[in-house]
Amino acid sequence: MRTLIALALLATPATAWEFTASPACMVSHETADGELKLSYDPRLPDPYAIAVTANTQWPDAPIFGMRFDGPSALTITTDRQIVDGPTVTVRDQSFGNVLNGLEFNATATALLGDNAISFPLNDAAPEIQRFRACIAAPIA
């Protein structure tokens, strides 16, 4: 029985938010429904990017949104998304509202057309703080 439980745990996606600082500042989180990656690379014209990869293809829709539910609830929308199969990406010069949404709320939901993927934020705050510290420091 213990072997089955161990195998089941290995087959499920990691539930923790993960921060890395190389080659660019990045924080990511994977669930059974998809993966969210936030990155900062000052070498790019639009240094901030958020990419949400679903288990299915995203629809072609005019507006992409991120809804943050919790104590500092907000919804952010844009028409600057790029859909590439199962991944929708948005790049910009600044992501202050996105960082605040991820750090200070309970869930983040990516919205495009009729599709929505939610990500729990219960362990996100420390990793978002590390991301903020990374973007404040120069990348070698």
What residue ranges belong to the model's regions?
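Residue-level marker of intrinsically disordered, low-complexity segments enriched
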Residues: 2-3, 81
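Sec-dependent N-terminal signal peptides
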Residues: 3-12
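A generic "folded-domain core" signal
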Residues: 15-140
